[in-house]
Amino acid sequence: MTKNDTCKRLLAAAAVLLAAAAMLHTLFVGLEIDEEYALSLGFRLVRGDRLFYSMWEPHQLSALPPALLIAVYTAVTGTTTGVLLFVRVTMLVLKAVLSVWFYRSLRAPLGRTNACLLALVLFVFTPKWFLGPDYVSQQFHFTLAAFLFFYGYYAPGPQQYRGLWRVAAGAVCACFSFLAYPQSAAAAPFLLLGLWLLDRAAPRRCGALLFLVSCAVCGGAFALWLLQGMGFDLPALLARAALILNDPQYDFTAGERLHTLAGQAAAVLQTCRVPALAAAAAVLAGVLSGRGSRPAPARLLERLLWYFTFFLTLWCTAHSLISVSLDFRHLYLAAALAGGWTFCCDRREVQHRTLRRLLFWLGWLPGMAAYLFILRSTLIALCTTFMYLFWPALCGAAALALKSPAAPHRRRQTQLLLLCMLLAAALPRLWLVQQTGWRCGTVREVAVQRITTGPAAGTWADEKAADMQECLYEALAPYAGQPVLQAIGEQHGLGFLMADGTLTVAQASVISGTDSDPRFEQYYTVLPEKQPRVILYDDAEVRDMAAFHTWLEQHFTITDRYTVQHGTASLQVLIVG
């Protein structure tokens, strides 16, 4: 073994250890409202709530995977205590499996080092910085699984065009991705087109047709299940779906959304200014140095875009740590755009042509289509939406790595870029801690406490979040089997999983604020059997809940009320007669 090989192995081991440390920190530390929401959705299904009938959640179509995990855990243990850690461990194992699968699939064309670095970036990345299977996480991971199944069928090699079951399995994964985040179904036509084009490369291939049939079967089966939950009353199902889709939070036009994004674009451009100047200087220096022949303008632009991605990755990593923020995902926008230009420049390259087409038609293009549709429909800020560009960015980076073995200095540059992408994903996870209220602090600033009871037992969170979990446990422990309403602006989804998982949810939605959603009142008129027996108020409420609290106390007979306190948390418990 040469000295160079030893250095490579040591660096690879260090990268693996860095990724493992980052994900272990994510596994045990931090608690965020959207992760709680994901588990509460699954819990509602486990406790007998039905989609659209008694669940009026905006993201209820993502409830199936967490419901399966919670059902398995409660069936084995008989309790929900510690279920959050179980779900996180399961997700971490699945991420590891997907990453190893990705590495084994692409190590031959990309090279071991490139494939390893990309797989580690894939392992460390989570869209919302927690491991729980919320709708965004499901959309990403099912998309990845679908691609890997399709890749296994179409990629050159001894198994090419063998095992049509791979296409069917990929279609099922794609359907779960669309179900988790329906806007991502915009990728479906491009997937179908890509499969059809790949089928044309060989006679008597029917991958596109099988994809279409599999999606139709999955969609039909899911529709029948929904209808069964509504008593096979199609008009009632359509009316309920229209009611839920008419969420006041999302009542904006395409023009209004475009105006909002345009206002936020200036800040994004300001962020990109310095890396863009550095990239231009690097390209200019390379041209003026006179080494080698001068590349064509298209290749110069490609080089500029990838240099820009490199410098922006460094900038995002530094500012994430310095500014104590998790929202510096701009590098994924740069990598996605650079990758798109690389696909364009290399479209006539003979080497790795099939692999390049796979990455483009089944990865980059569907990912970009899904992102544009999500961008139109989501409420989040422009810079936050860049998390949805990770998959196109990864496909673009893989396209860059496809040609790096032909030029040693380009190979080193590509590996340096991939290493920086790994650092950008891993270092903030090690240095920052997610806090209550979509904030974060450094590991030196945030004093984390171990949660010892309830569904989050065995994890650590900031003092406020940990105290609230303990307070919820103490407040709800006496009311096993009772329907609970949290009349709280910032819902605590894990609160419904207290009392060993015997509670039921007595409200329309766990995530839509009761202070701003008038459908909460309509819910009890349409479903009188869902009236609560226990109501919780948060004494440290961050929203104006006075009007809704007044409505509750006018429409429900309150027979008792008292306060439960634990550390910084204080809850009022109201008993309905």
What are these regions (language model features)?
Residues 12-18, 203-228, 267-283, 298-312, ...:
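Hydrophobic alpha-helical membrane-interfacial segments at the cytosolic entry of transmembrane helices
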Residues 39-43, 54-81, 177:
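Short hydrophobic/aromatic helix or loop-helix immediately within or flanking a transmembrane segment
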Residues 57, 182-184, 188, 428-512, ...:
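Short periplasmic/luminal acceptor-recognition loop of GT-C membrane glycosyltransferases, typified by
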Residues 97-124:
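Transmembrane-helix signature of polytopic, membrane-embedded enzymes
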Residues 127, 163-182, 188-193, 216-217, ...:
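Membrane-interface alpha helices of multi-pass inner-membrane proteins
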Residues 131-140:
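Short acidic/glycine- and proline-prone juxtamembrane loop motifs at membrane-interface regions
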Residues 139-158, 166-174, 197, 335-339:
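Specific aromatic-rich, kink-prone transmembrane helix
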Residues 155, 187-223, 288-293:
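Perimembrane helix-loop-helix junctions
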